[in-house]
Amino acid sequence: TMFPAMKAVPALAGAERQPCFAPGCGFVRWDNPLPVVAAVTECVDRDGAILLARNHAWPDKMFALVTGFLERGETPEAAVAREVMEEVALEAVSVKLLGAYPFARKNEIIIGYHVQARGEIRLNEELAEYRLVRPEQLRPWPQATGLAVRDWMLARGMVVPEIAEGNLFVHADI
């Protein structure tokens, strides 16, 4: 295996680390969370509608924010603008940080942004379809990218509907 002779041992703040016990190895698997960017994408040339996308692997009517991974040497701001361009072909004209949100289930840290974007929407091969949703139709969910939606709504003084427990993806009246 990639990590031979490893076992979990107590370490910092009660977290477990997996050191290698091979003589002289010294390797420790830290299992740090992976940073992921997410975009609350406001289409400024479509009356401020919010773009939600559905991945081919997801059930019908399951839509979420555009998300993606950082590339080596890339800032999170550049990454979220690139992901919006790659996934839906929109040009980011403004990128503003909303916050960072833990997503323990996937061991990720979601870095949420409000991205104002414009252009002709064209989906890449990852996505099956998209919806443009009026901001008041959004319904935040209790984890990760849903918290970015909540914070975006609160920053605009919007009434935020009660968060639906157990819903891991965006919910909108669409």
Describe each model-derived feature in a short phrase.
Residues N32-P33, C43-E86:
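Conserved Nudix-box catalytic region and its N-terminal flanking loop in Nudix hydrolases
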Residues C43-D47, H56, Q116-E120, P135-Q137:
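Short loop segments at secondary-structure junctions
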Residues A11, E91-G99:
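A short coil-to-beta-strand element that immediately follows conserved catalytic motifs
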Residues G99-E126, R131, P135, W152:
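Active-site-adjacent beta-strand/loop module that shapes the phosphate/pyrophosphate-binding cleft
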Residues G119, L132-I174:
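Long C-terminal interaction/binding lobes of large macromolecular proteins
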Residues R17-P19, V40, L52, G112-H114, ...:
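Conserved hydrophobic/aromatic beta-strand scaffold that supports enzyme active sites
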Residues T1-A39:
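Acidic, metal-coordinating catalytic segment for phosphate/diphosphate chemistry
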